[in-house]
């Protein structure tokens, strides 16, 4: 079973912000899938995707706890037999750069920190989407909670759409090695 979690903040005022890139990916993913059932549980909007042949269910999750408390929602849904995939923004990657990694520190991302703390482990997949850095450290909060410029937004949408396509493949074949390789080699500034 896959537990695919997009990190973001609920509310219309946040939906187009850089910090909500995890939700952008899930929004695009949902347009590519059929047979999703929506449920509200565990402080989240949860879309279930049932696989009749495999007798499995995958979950696409939008935590409604706000970014810094994402661990509360994930802990409520997570079971050890699940493969957890968390999609989030990354200030240390250039705009549109994508990276997949298994385990490791939160690198200062409070949503990821919350999940690590709640689960008591860092053993899960992270899909990072670069949003770049502001010019000044004092601007970080306003930057992540701000909307990207038009050219930035186009690059981020290309990256989010590519990740959504790769998640569709992962849902089908569970090939994490290929998933990681494809996303790590993607360049959102080129036509792939």
UniProtKB/Swiss-Prot annotation:
Signal peptide: none annotated. The active site is at 19 (proton acceptor). TRNA binds at residues 14, 66, 68. The record marks 89 as: Stabilizes the basic form of H active site to accept a proton. Pfam families: Pept_tRNA_hydro (PF01195). CDD domains: PTH. It is found in: Cytoplasm. Belongs to the PTH family. This is Peptidyl-tRNA hydrolase. The lineage of its organism: Bacteria, Pseudomonadati, Coprothermobacterota, Coprothermobacteria, Coprothermobacterales.
């Amino acid at each position: 079973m896959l537990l695919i979690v997009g990190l973001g903040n609920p509310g219309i005022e946040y939906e187009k912000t850089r910090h909500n890139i995890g939700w952008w990916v899930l929004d695009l993913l949902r347009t590519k899938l059929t047979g999703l059932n929506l449920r509200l549980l565990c402080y989240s909007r949860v879309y279930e995707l049932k696989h009749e042949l495999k007798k499995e269910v995958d979950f696409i999750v939008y935590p409604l706890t706000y970014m810094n408390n994402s661990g509360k929602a994930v802990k409520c849904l997570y079971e050890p037999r699940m493969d957890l995939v968390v999609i989030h923004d990354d200030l240390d990657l250039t705009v549109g750069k994508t990276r997949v990694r298994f385990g490791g520190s939160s690198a200062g991302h409070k949503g990821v920190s919350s999940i690590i703390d709640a689960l008591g482990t860092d053993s899960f997949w992270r899909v990072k989407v670069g949003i770049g850095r502001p010019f000044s450290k004092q601007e970080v909060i306003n930057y992540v909670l701000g909307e990207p410029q038009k050219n930035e937004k186009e690059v981020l949408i290309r990256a989010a759409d590519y990740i959504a396509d790769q998640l569709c493949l992962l849902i089908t074949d569970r090939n994490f090695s290929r998933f990681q390789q494809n996303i790590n080699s993607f360049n959102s500034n080129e036509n792939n």
